Amino acid sequence: MFCEQCEQTASGNGCHQWGACGKSPEVNAVQDLLVYCLRGLAPVTIKARELGISCHEADVFTGETLFATMTNVNFERKRFNVYIRQCIHIREGLKNSIEKISKKPISWSEVSNYQPNFSESLAEQGREKDLTFISQSTNNVDIFSLKLTVLYGIKGTASYTFHAQELGQEDEKVYAFIQEALASLDRNDLSLEDWVNIALKVGEINLRAMELLDQGHTTTYGHPTPTKVPLNPKQGKGILVSGHDIKQLAALLQQTVNKGLMVYTHGELLPAHGYPILKEKYPHFYGHYGTAWQNQTKDFAHFPGAIIVTTNCLMPPHETYEDKLFTIGPVGYSGINYLSSDDKGVPDYSLAIETSLKMAGFTTDEAPRHVMVGFAHNTVLNVSEQVIEAVKKGEIRHFFLVGGCDGAKPGRTYYTEFVEKVPKDCIVLTLACGKFRFFDKQLGEIGNLPRLMDVGQCNDAYSAIKIALGLAEAFQVSVNDLPLSMILSWYEQKAVAVLLTLLYLGIKDIRLGPTLPAFITPNVLRFLSETYNLQPITTPDQDLVACLA
């Protein structure tokens, strides 16, 4: 087994016996075989595009299946077997279309002609392809490092592309680049500089993917507005939705109208409460339950209703709640209820709804607690004049973007302590599940501006970027000259994509933790440090002094 795509890799050197995420070596190998098959599909789509043949089915399929191979998304080996069959079927169909149009015979590469042996172990075939990929790439470990960076980055981009496509937002340029990046992984003629440029291109395309997703969310559900979200359960029956997929949350809300259920969010669906159309249309869209993904074994066990996981992060479920757990879309786990989608991409949630209605629900009202969400780019930039005036008056000294992924490894208390120690004349912007280290802290206000502003989900890094660019334009300086520091945490491949976007934009002085990626070699890290001053976190006190100097 070889996997080092997430932050919690064993001893910081990659997982070689069993995934720290709970992924078995067999699932890892079948996932890698799927990626190999996608690498073979990619050159076929590139040729099809040249000939004007539609690749939409292949593009959407690639987005979903790359998403499924991300950390804590899908552990179901049989689903990957099906994906591999579908991949080969789509590839051969495109080949047939190409051959009907092409004026000369096409000579396909080995990877594009590969045929898995479905009567033999796919896991073993995946291991063989892993070894070949590693052996062909390790003549230059720095190039191999950047190849992995590109692969993990496009996995993150694919997840945002998948969600945007669900909401009707697509861009041929995004699809085409994902295929080009996959095809490039089998090229051995590219230099280190070429791979740096491809990695930065991932960042550029990921920015567009996040923009599409932002457009999908805001045109469908309205621009987020500051909203008070209850954290205290309410007496009555409920159903819990975890993950990131706001379209699926909206579908569940529609299917639970007049059912006598309160709908609670979990994890990164907290920011969904800021979308005005959801709050206005669905009065049973009540509150938020629990904290970050790594606490789900406790949160899910205690929740007295059904739980639907729409995306990552899914942990191997505990027997205390596996019967009331449901997965959808690219998410899966062996033995757990899976709700398949109709031709519009929406599951029938009846089984989950019936499960919740049979359960006791919350028997009492808990003491009121709440947090605020909804400070996305539209909200913040609408008060930019007020912000600028406060900066000029010295009321606001500095902005900190403290966000990213949360995780279970030690060292993440750094982010809690950092935010607690931020001076009272500074604003903290946050996003993604890293916020759960401090999301309920009462930091007060500067004037009528809250000192802690929740920008949204991990994909709402786009919102944070728009805020930074908007403030830079207003102050007539570059983003790097703003009184702004980025203190980021990472865990999985979406964070890799977002980091590449920030580097593509030329943003410097980012502090990253709690540990640096295992797939980044010392030479690549040196390049990032020298070019962008990317640096690891140290201690909250030391980093605060440096940021405010």
Curated annotation (Swiss-Prot):
Which EC number(s) does the record attach to this protein?
A: 1.7.99.1
Cofactor binding note of this UniProt entry: Binds 1 [4Fe-4S] cluster. Binds 1 hybrid [4Fe-2O-2S] cluster.
Per its UniProt record, the required cofactor names are: [4Fe-4S] cluster; hybrid [4Fe-2O-2S] cluster
What GO molecular function annotations does the UniProt record carry, in alphabetical order?
4 iron, 4 sulfur cluster binding; hydroxylamine reductase activity; metal ion binding; peroxidase activity
The record's function comment reads: Catalyzes the reduction of hydroxylamine to form NH(3) and H(2)O.
Biological process (GO) annotations held by this record are: response to hydrogen peroxide
Q: Which InterPro entries match?
A: HCP/CODH, Hydroxylam_reduct, Prismane-like_a/b-sand, Prismane-like_sf, Prismane_a-bundle
Name the residues that bind [4Fe-4S] cluster. C3, C6, C15, C21
Q: Which residues carry this modification: Cysteine persulfide?
A: C405
User: What are the subcellular locations of this protein?
Assistant: Cytoplasm
This chain's source organism reads Crocosphaera subtropica (strain ATCC 51142 / BH68) (Cyanothece sp. (strain ATCC 51142))
Protein known as: Hydroxylamine reductase
- Family named by the database record: Belongs to the HCP family.
Q: Could you give one GO CC term from the UniProt record?
A: cytoplasm
Q: Which gene encodes it?
A: hcp
Its catalytic activity? A + NH4(+) + H2O = hydroxylamine + AH2 + H(+)
Keyword Iron-sulfur on entry: yes
This protein's source sits in the domain of life called Bacteria
Q: Which SUPFAM superfamilies match?
A: Prismane protein-like
